[in-house]
């Protein structure tokens, strides 16, 4: 049965496509903490790397449009927090993450906790404008919940003294930083509600890092603020600092000094109602913008999943992979060629005429030396043989006989006289001795 006519039989490409859509549509956005390894940044500007922990790892891709927003350059070994979409790289069937944002793990964990608590409390309606209490237009007594030694307290008191010196103030001192701060802040709010001596509370502190302000992002503090029967103005840090307490409070002031202005009548008779309404309008507008932004983000994610850019991204990733494979292949090819050239050079050195001539000269020198040694040995043997022969000849030589006292008589012509019949009267004879000769005449 053909796979083209039976819908229950998948091709590999169709299976990978279905799995990719399933991952992207069902799981959506995930937050992930891990260590970067195998980091690569090709000329395309995209980033490819692996996120791992002690037990597992997953491949990741972060495209140029997103990674240019990262405030640091990742390196192998970095611990990071990433926001990602699950996907599948269809050509290889590799499950991977498409990274949308990245930050160092320390700040990232706090931000992740912040976002999670914000979403949780928002879903319960703690941020809803309908649940917020109105700030009294002309408070009769103001409660301040902050550190008794912090600059925020003195800023608030200075503003109140300048604007409305007759306004009564009750200070509820508490820690505003550290592990015990959240409990103490919640207890101070509860104490102010129990005593019920103020008709508005300012809860806050001066500026600081995310860690310094973290007690105002605590769920206990948030729920205590929401449960307060006395209206609360949050005044945490500077205008750019935003905490969970700001969302839960009945009104948010950008600074402690601004909070003091909101609860005091200006000597120049500023319209406090207008300021309060402006603050409420700002809060409502921020809430509206937050909701609209969440809707836009959701719609953009849905739109992006159908956008041709994703196809282009996948093709770009495939092109980057091919580029990396080509580069590795070229490096391997060049290494093999270098090895081959090295072997050929070695062979050429072995076949070099200069080398051969040198070896032949050395061989001839060895042969010449062997011949000289052989000739010397031959001459030595011949001399020895001649000496032996000379000794033998010497033993039978007439001269040796003469040395023993004998003599040889010859005629004048050199004929040896061995018989008397060989001579006659008047012949001249020569007698040879060992040391000379004697001439005589026969009578």
Swiss-Prot record:
GO terms for cellular component: cytoplasm; exodeoxyribonuclease VII complex. Its main location: cytoplasm. This is Exodeoxyribonuclease 7 large subunit. GO terms for molecular function: exodeoxyribonuclease VII activity; nucleic acid binding. It catalyses: Exonucleolytic cleavage in either 5'- to 3'- or 3'- to 5'-direction to yield nucleoside 5'-phosphates. The lineage of its organism: Bacteria, Pseudomonadati, Pseudomonadota, Gammaproteobacteria, Vibrionales. The gene is xseA. Heterooligomer composed of large and small subunits. Signal peptide: none annotated. It is found in: Cytoplasm. It comes from the Bacteria. InterPro entries: Exonuc_VII_L (IPR003753), Exonuc_VII_lsu_C (IPR020579), OB-fold_nuc-bd_dom (IPR025824).
């Amino acid at each position: 049965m053909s796979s083209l006519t039976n819908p229950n039989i998948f091709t590999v490409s169709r299976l990978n496509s279905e799995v990719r859509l399933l991952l992207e549509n069902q799981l959506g956005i995930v937050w992930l903490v891990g260590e970067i390894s195998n980091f690569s940044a090709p000329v395309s500007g995209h980033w490819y790397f692996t996120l791992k922990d002690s037990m597992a790892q997953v491949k990741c891709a972060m495209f140029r449009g997103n990674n240019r927003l990262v405030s640091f350059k990742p390196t192998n070994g970095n611990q990071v927090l990433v926001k990602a979409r699950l996907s599948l790289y269809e050509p290889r069937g590799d499950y991977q993450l498409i990274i949308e944002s990245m930050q160092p793990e320390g700040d990232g964990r706090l931000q992740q906790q912040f976002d999670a608590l914000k979403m949780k409390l928002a879903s319960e309606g703690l941020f809803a404008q309908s649940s917020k209490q109105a700030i009294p237009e002309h408070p009769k007594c103001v409660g301040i919940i902050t550190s008794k030694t912090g600059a925020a307290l003195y800023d608030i008191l200075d503003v109140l003294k300048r604007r409305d010196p007759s306004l009564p103030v009750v200070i509820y001192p508490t820690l505003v930083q550290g592990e015990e701060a959240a409990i103490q802040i919640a207890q101070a709010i509860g104490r102010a509600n129990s005593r019920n001596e103020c008709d508005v509370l300012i809860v806050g502190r001066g500026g600081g890092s995310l860690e310094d302000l973290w007690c105002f992002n605590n769920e206990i503090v948030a729920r205590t603020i929401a449960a307060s029967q006395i209206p609360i103005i949050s005044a945490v840090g500077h205008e750019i600092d935003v905490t969970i307490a700001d969302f839960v409070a009945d009104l948010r002031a950008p600074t402690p000094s601004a909070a003091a202005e909101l609860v005091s009548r200006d000597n120049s008779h500023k319209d406090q109602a207008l300021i309060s309404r402006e603050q409420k309008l700002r809060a409502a507008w921020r809430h509206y913008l937050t909701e609209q932004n969440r809707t836009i983000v959701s719609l953009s994610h849905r739109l992006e999943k159908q956008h041709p850019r994703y196809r282009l991204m996948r093709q770009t990733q495939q092109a980057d992979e091919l580029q990396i494979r080509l580069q590795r292949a070229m490096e391997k090819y060049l290494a093999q060629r270098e090895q081959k050239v090295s072997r050929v050079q070695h062979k050429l050195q072995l076949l070099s005429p200069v080398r051969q001539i040198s070896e032949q000269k050395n061989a001839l020198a060895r042969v010449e030396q062997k011949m000289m040694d052989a000739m010397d040995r031959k001459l030595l043997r011949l001399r020895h043989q001649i000496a032996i022969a000379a000794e033998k000849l010497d033993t039978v030589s007439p001269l040796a006989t003469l040395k023993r006292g004998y003599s040889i008589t010859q005629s004048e012509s050199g004929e040896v006289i061995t018989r008397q019949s060989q001579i006659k009267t008047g012949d001249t004879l020569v007698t040879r001795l060992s040391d000379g000769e004697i001439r005589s005449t026969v009578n």
